[in-house]
Every structure is written in C-alpha cells, then in structure tokens.
C-alpha cells in the first residue's frame, strides 16, 4: 500500500446520470446591519450566535499576515472565526459567519492551533480516539485555508510499548515546547488523573527539524506533584511510587513502579503551561472538572529537563486581582486579544450542560509584559457582552407589545446557568426603539414577566397573538410538561402589561415540551394554534371560535405528516409558519440543530407537506435550532432569525432577486480537501451526500462509502497511489470528481 494518494480538485463535465431536480430559489445571506443596544452600548457582534463553553486559539485564517481569533465551543463542537481587521491604527475583530466551513468536519471535544513544523502556519490538534489527532495547515494566500490529516492518532513510547498517546476526551492538554528545542511536546494527565505525564517530541533529536510528531514518555510525574482523586487539592513534592526527585538527565524516565492502587478513570482536567516568572521552565494552570477555580503551580527550577519540582500552589489565582470563580471546569488560554502585543488570559468552562453559559468567558488583561505577565480582571463576558446571549437553545420571537407598530424581539431559551438551582428557563425582552425602516433593538429585561420565578421547567416557548380582538397580542407559553399557559394583555398604554396566567390553557396537553405558534393556518382570518411536541410531531388546533373568543380544537395530531427524526428519539420541533406573497411556508427548528423547510401547505392541510429543503441553507447549528421569519425592516425582503444551541441569534436577509415562487435548476456543489492527502479525504457538499463511490480511471469500483450528512471524511489508507474519480450518486444530481 502506498500511503500517499494524490488529490486534484477538478470537476469533470461528464455526468453519469441526468438527475435534473428543481429546488426553490430561496437564498438568505448573513446580515448584521440591525443594531442592538444594551446598557447604552451598541453591541459589536449582536448577531454572532452566542458562546457557551469556549476554547480559544489564534490562526492567520486569511493569510493576511495577522492572527485571527478562532473559537471552538465544546457545546456540540462548533467553530467561530473572528477576523483581525486593521483600519489605520485601529485594530478590531470582525465575525465571519462562514468561517467554520473551512475547518475539518471531525473536530471534536477540543481544538488547539499551534505550529508544530515551524512553517509559520498554525496546525490543528483535536481529539482522536482516546488521544490526539493532528491536521497540518496546507493553505496559503492563493488557495485559502486547507488542512491535511497528518496523524489520525498520535503515539508515544510508553517505556518500550508504542501506544496511543492518551488524552481523555474531557481533557485539554498542554501542547507546548517543554524542553526549549522548538518542537511541540505534550503535557497531559494520566489515565488515573492524579499525575501529569510529559511526552517529549523527539523530532529535533532524531531528524534535526520539527516536522515530525514522534513522542516518548519521559516522565510520569512531571513537576513532582499529585492532584487528589477526590478533589482538586494539590500535593507538592509527592513521594508516591510514580514520583522521584533530583535531576533527570536530558531527560530520562524516572524509575517507575506500578501503583499499588488500581487506576481509576480520569474525570477531567485542563492544563495551560506558561513560564510566568521568566525562569526558563514552565509553570502550570490547572482546571478541574468539579471546580470553578484554577490552581496556579510555580516551577522551582531554572533549566528544562532537570525534573524540577513545582514548589508552590495558588488556588485563588490570580490572587492579585479578582480570583477566577467560573463554574464549572475552567480552561485557560493564553493569547493577545486586545492587540497590544502582550498575551492576555481567557478562561472558559468546559463541563457541557452544567457550566455557566451566559457569562462564560473571563478576560484577564496582561498589564505586565510578555516575559512577566500580570493578569488583571477585565470582564466575565469577553465577546459575549457584545452579543445577544441567553444561555442554551435560544428561540427568537417577534411581537409588538408596546403598541407602537414596531415588532419587539423576545429571546427564550432552553435554560441558562443559575448558581443555586443550576438552571432556569426565561425570556429576554428587547424593545424596538427604531423605526419601521430602521429597527433598533434595545435590551430591556433579561427575565420578562419574571417567568424564571414561576418554576416552569426547561424550554419555555412563547408565542404572541391577538386573542381578544383589541389589536394587542396575548402571550401563550408552551411548557416542559406539555401544557400551555395563557397571559392576557392588559396594557392600555405603551408599556407591556400582562395579567395573571391561566394554566393548562383550554386543556391542551401534547405530552412534553410544548412549542406553540399562533398562526392563521387555514386562512379564515382567525388565529389557529400549531404545537410541536418532544417526540417530533406537530399538532394542529383549529380555531373553531372567533377572533375575540377563540376555541382551539384538535384537528390533526400529525400535521403535514411532519415527524422530526433525529439521532435521538426526541425531535423537539419548533414550528414557524409564515406567509409570503399569500403563500404559506413552514420552517421547523429541531433538536439536531438543522432547519427543515416545507411548502405545498395551502389547500393541503390534510395531506403531507413537501419537504423542500433539509437542512435549509446547509445550516447545522449543533442542537436546538429555532427560527423566526418576517420582514422586520420593511424593505420587501424577508429576514430570517435563527436561534441555536449557543444561546445567540443569527440574522440573515432574503437575497435580492430570489423569489419563493420561482424555481430554477440548481446543482449541488461538491468540494474535496486536502490536496494532496496521505490518509483521508473530506467531501463537503451543499446537499446530503448519501452514497459515494471511488472509481479508478477504468471505471472499476474501488470503494463504496455511505454518508448521511453534507460533510464526510473518507478513509483512503488502503488506496494505492493514483488518480481516482468520486461519483456522488445521491440526489439531486450525479457527479464525477477527479482525485
């Protein structure tokens, strides 16, 4: 087998099968032009989608000579790109909504960018099965960002046994030059979770350069300390069987005996290794899965490779400023984020689902120097303070509750972190303080109607509509228990006033996690009620009463044949029906983070609706997608607002010339990378790929591969060197691509 397969991005003009397919010409583009104001400040990234559990790195993403900020969010493995922009002497970040498309699709659990081969381009380290996977940065200013899978899994010599270099999926290791020889070594907690292992990169010693990733375990107790198994307490100068003191020449592995106690599964730790005191050896910041602080360990040595011991520990780091207390499982990241040439410290939690998720990026500004940093607390919401950000699973809803003719913005959520009871679901309120043509959303209240105090469970889902005939919208809430709450609008002026809740509204109970929408579905000029429920269907309650006295009667328990099926038994559909040019459409958000777009609804309420696009616009938002569609700025173009797992909102605008009633022939786009490749190739498409076949130039089938998404990585380790064709036989079109 030849480990090198040559890839060429060339789309052939021949098509094996003419599978002409017509799809709606319905395109939206990201647009952040509507301002959002909070506490008197205009937000810089209002529509950037939010942040939950961030890991930060830097990368010259666009090869323009400066470092851009790359954010990996452990909440469903999402990537955000903030490009470094320079205008005169002013430096700033600009959110790139499409930046994640140029990263490998299999980045999981963690992502760290660092230049392992000293070519001036940061490479990508992520999770491999039980360890570390590495992509080499093969891009340039001409071809753009490209990645080559360099190592599917890093290996290390464990005292004569060559095994996968173990790093728990929960952990963030320190990938850093420990010994000062310019190649990147790895510090990581052992599988027992109490000692830090030092895996030395032997590239420089073996080959005289840094472009290899060959590791040897040199120390099972680097720094000579132990972290307690039942807490995050640190024992310095550990005298246990794994640890020794004294010099370790060049270094050599200390004498190691098997621990008497049985190793326990490692729960989770984060490491940042930095020389804080310019002593020549690395110190540590350690985060633990069950705690909100960082332990700062200072190294008492002055020369690398001498097995120097950690001599002090500060559990209140930074003790000279506001000590970190960030629930839960904080990681620390060392990079310059304010463009002054000095690396700052960012901290963010990593316990998915149980950590702080609204004010979850603490920034400590470096007011010292590069060699002697001095970290001073600046904010607990770096980037987040400039976004719409409301925990996990944001849901955008518009309603004019101030009776001024301008739609206001409400953002519900699945839950937000709460220190006492851990989570709460609530609704934020942004008043529209602009005009019809130029809306401006101004933050008013993080907990509209104090709903978080009502103990309504997870994921309260609002919908507004006039149910009394007075022109003012009432509020209906869908609840976790499957029932609805009704809040009458009692306002007589410009301020929203809602009366006491009516529980179990009209006896409606859909089981669990009711997601209601008030909408005149049958065009009889009275509002009907569509309710999504946890398992994936929509229930249609027709208004058989009047506009001022509605009676909602169940007509269809599986409206349109819609049944949201995801990777779990739960669909969590969030229905949003809307009307454009007197035609009804539906977009459905769901647990899988994708959006389903339906048409053929009018005159077909008893039939199965047509699934026109899935996933709509190719968007994959991690989980809990939610949509709202309306022409908010009255420019005769629809706006699309998308809620998502990370607690913020994306805003998109209908493309000029794109018309929902028109159709055109659209071929899916298919791209391949890297070029060349040694092991795998990633296929990206604008449609779900389905079956992919690898053919040689004689037409012989070399490999069949099934992919149920728009992005797949195909292993080519058993493919001989040569030129190949990829045939995509999935709908809507067959295509041949030369490899």
Which residue stretches match the model-derived regions?
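Bacterial Sec-dependent N-terminal signal peptides
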Residues: 1-28, 660-662, 700, 731, ...
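Short, glycine-anchored, charge-dense loop/turn motifs used at functional sites
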Residues: 694-702, 724
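Short coil/turn motif common to extracellular beta-sandwich-like domains
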Residues: 675-682
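C-terminal tail/sorting-segment detector
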Residues: 721-739
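Glycine-centered tight-turn motifs at strand-turn-strand junctions
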Residues: 669, 701-719, 732-733
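Short proline/glycine-enriched turn/loop motifs at strand-loop junctions of beta-rich domains
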Residues: 592, 685-690
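Beta-propeller-forming repeat regions
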Residues: 24-660
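Residue-level detector of functionally pivotal "anchor" positions at catalytic/ligand-binding pockets or at interdomain
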Residues: 653-673, 686, 700
């Amino acid at each position: 087998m030849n480990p090198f397969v040559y890839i060429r991005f060339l789309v052939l003009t021949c098509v094996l099968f003419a599978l002409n397919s017509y799809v709606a010409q319905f395109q939206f583009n990201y647009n952040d032009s509507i301002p959002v104001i909070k506490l008197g400040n205009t937000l810089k990234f209002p529509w950037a989608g939010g942040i939950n559990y961030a890991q930060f790195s830097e990368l010259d993403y666009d090869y323009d000579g400066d470092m851009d900020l790359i954010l990996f969010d452990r909440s469903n493995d999402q990537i955000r790109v903030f490009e470094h922009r320079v205008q005169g002497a002013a430096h700033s970040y600009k959110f790139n909504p499409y930046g994640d498309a140029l990263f490998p699709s299999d980045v999981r659990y963690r992502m760290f960018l660092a230049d392992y081969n000293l070519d001036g381009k940061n490479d990508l380290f992520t999770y491999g099965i039980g360890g570390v996977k590495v992509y080499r940065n093969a891009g340039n200013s001409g071809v753009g960002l490209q990645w080559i899978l360099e190592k599917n899994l890093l290996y290390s010599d464990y005292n004569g046994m060559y095994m996968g270099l173990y790093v728990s999926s929960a952990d963030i290791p320190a990938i850093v030059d420990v010994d000062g020889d310019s190649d990147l070594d790895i510090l990581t907690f052992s599988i027992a979770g109490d000692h830090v292992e030092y895996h030395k990169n032997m590239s420089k010693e073996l080959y005289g350069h840094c472009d290899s990733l060959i590791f040897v375990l040199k120390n099972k107790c680097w720094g000579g300390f132990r972290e307690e198994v039942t807490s995050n307490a640190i024992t310095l100068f550990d005298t246990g069987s794994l640890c020794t003191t004294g010099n370790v020449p060049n270094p050599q592995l200390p004498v190691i005996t098997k621990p008497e106690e049985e190793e326990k599964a490692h729960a989770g730790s984060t490491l940042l290794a930095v020389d804080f005191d310019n002593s020549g050896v690395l110190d540590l910041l350690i985060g633990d899965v069950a705690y909100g602080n960082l332990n700062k360990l200072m190294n008492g040595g002055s020369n690398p490779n001498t097995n120097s011991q950690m001599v002090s520990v500060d559990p209140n780091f930074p003790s000279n400023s506001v000590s970190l207390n960030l629930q839960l499982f904080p990681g620390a990241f060392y990079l310059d984020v304010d463009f002054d040439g000095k690396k700052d410290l960012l901290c963010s939690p990593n316990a998915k689902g149980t950590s702080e998720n609204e004010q979850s990026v603490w920034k400590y500004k470096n007011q010292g120097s590069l060699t002697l940093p001095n970290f001073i607390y600046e904010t607990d919401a770096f980037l987040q303070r400039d976004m719409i950000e409301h925990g996990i699973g944001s849901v955008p809803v518009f309603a004019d509750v101030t009776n001024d003719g301008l739609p206001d913005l409400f953002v519900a959520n699945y839950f937000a972190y709460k220190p006492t009871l851990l989570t709460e679901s609530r609704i934020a309120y942004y008043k529209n303080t602009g005009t019809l043509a130029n809306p401006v959303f101004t933050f008013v209240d993080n907990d509209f109607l104090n709903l978080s105090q009502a103990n309504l469970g997870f994921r309260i889902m609002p919908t507004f509509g006039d149910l009394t005939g007075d022109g003012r919208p009432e509020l209906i809430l869908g609840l976790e228990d499957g029932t609805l709450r009704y809040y009458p609008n009692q306002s007589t002026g410009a301020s929203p006033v809602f009366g006491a809740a009516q529980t179990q509204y009209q006896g409606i109970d859909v089981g669990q996690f009711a997601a209601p929408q008030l909408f005149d579905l049958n065009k009889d000029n009275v509002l009907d009620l569509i309710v999504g429920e946890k398992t994936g269907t929509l229930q249609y309650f027709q208004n058989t009463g009047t506009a001022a006295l509605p009676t909602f009667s169940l007509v269809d328990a599986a409206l349109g044949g819609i049944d949201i099926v995801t990777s779990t038994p739960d669909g969590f559909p969030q229905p949003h029906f809307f009307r454009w040019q007197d035609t009804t459409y539906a977009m459905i958000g769901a647990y899988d983070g994708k959006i389903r777009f339906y048409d053929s609804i009018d005159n077909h309420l008893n039939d199965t609706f047509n699934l026109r696009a899935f996933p709509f616009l190719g968007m994959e938002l991690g989980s809990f997608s939610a949509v709202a569609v309306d022409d908010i700025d009255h420019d005769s173009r629809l706006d699309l607002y998308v809620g998502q797992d990370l607690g913020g909102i994306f805003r998109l605008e209908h493309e000029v010339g794109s018309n929902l009633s028109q159709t055109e022939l659209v071929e899916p786009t298919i791209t391949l990378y890297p070029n060349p490749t040694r092991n795998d190739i990633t296929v990206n498409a604008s449609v779900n790929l389905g079956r992919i076949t690898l053919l040689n130039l004689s037409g012989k089938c070399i490999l069949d591969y099934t992919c149920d998404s728009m992005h797949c990585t195909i292993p080519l380790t058993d493919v001989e060197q040569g030129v190949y064709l990829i045939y995509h036989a999935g709908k809507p079109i067959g295509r041949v691509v030369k490899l």
